[in-house]
Amino acid sequence: GYFSKSLKSTKSAADFTSTKLYINLENILKDSDTLFLTVPDGSISQIWDYMRNLDIRNKNICHCSGSISSTAFFDAQNKGAYAYSIHPLCAINDRYEAYKNLANAVFTIEGNSEHLDSLMQIFQKCGNDIIKIDTQKKALYHASAVMASNLVTALFATSIDLLNRCGVDKKMAKNILLPLLQGNVANLATFDIKDALTGPVERND
């Protein structure tokens, strides 16, 4: 099932996933053994402050933040619940299309040991690899993902700007540089990091 603060959003998501629509948190909690808070990072603690006062005994409470650990649900165990963070290493930019990439995504998980293995098995049965990470190293993990994803995009945008300053139209600059980027990604997929290097870095110019 699905619940959101907006009825429109709730209906849209429930229709899209062919699941039940819920109009309050209490009812979806009652009907579920596992809940995923798929919300912005800044909203996790706010929702938890409300949720922790409800009957969450024997519930798996999960969020999908890359940077925040399961300790966001700071007293879940005292409330009889089990806290987890489960994060897909996948670029998601469209709620109605990006889910298609999840089939090939690797997930990471950390949290209470009680149901951790059974949660991992759910993803494994879907064909996904899922890796346990150290709760204390969640920020380090997130920094790795950001550098491989967001920073690459930012560097590519800078490359376009530099070529534009050379008099090349931005659209053309993107088209010119994309094969270069794609070639490097292909090299990374095929060779060790050192052997994937090309150009002045590889030549030590």
Identify the meaning behind each predicted range.
Residues 8-10, 71-72:
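Short, glycine/polar-rich helix-capping loops at beta-to-alpha or helix-loop-helix junctions
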